[in-house]
Amino acid sequence: DIDVHDWRLGPTEVEQHRVPVTSAVRTWLDIARLRPLSDGLAVGDALLRSRVGISAEIRTSIDARGSIRGIRRARLAADHIDGARETPLESGSWAYFVEHRVALPAMQHEIRSRDGRFVGRVDFWWRHAGVVGECDGRLKYTDRADLYAEKRREDALRELGFTVVRWGWQDLRGEALAQRLRRVLA
């Protein structure tokens, strides 16, 4: 799909080295304003992982735009971008939590056994409820050895008394995942 939008570009946003471009921040801002929150978070999270100090540039860019269409959505995305999320599915999951008012978890949390042995690093961690959240794409465990290792890791988490909730892209549609999370977080 191609979306065409008319919005004036600044001189550094139009051309660099004789190639027509928009800056990384400008591109993010357009995505954050005009696309779903999950898209703005996925691109923003990647920007934060790739460039130190970009967060201030993002805020300055938003503030300079005043009240253009979609700016509130961009502000919401800016409030939630975080370089700790490592995949678009993790970013999409965070957007889902925000949109469905699910309690926001810690991210990329290390879990250790009672004797201090490393058990694993989990995508999402709701400490107050002892709940681990794992989001998995279809291609994550195509190798049998990886699948078996993940099963053993999940068994170890459950043996420590944690509830493990898993989801994929398809679960980010509708209310079922939010209801399931609210139930285990209560």
Residue ranges with predicted function:
Residues 1-106:
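Phosphate-handling catalytic interfaces
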Residues 1-4, 15-20, 89, 120-121, ...:
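Surface-exposed beta-strand edges and their flanking turn/coil or helix-capping segments
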Residues 93-96, 100-109, 120-124, 130-132:
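Conserved active-site beta-strand-loop modules that form the wall/rim of enzyme catalytic pockets
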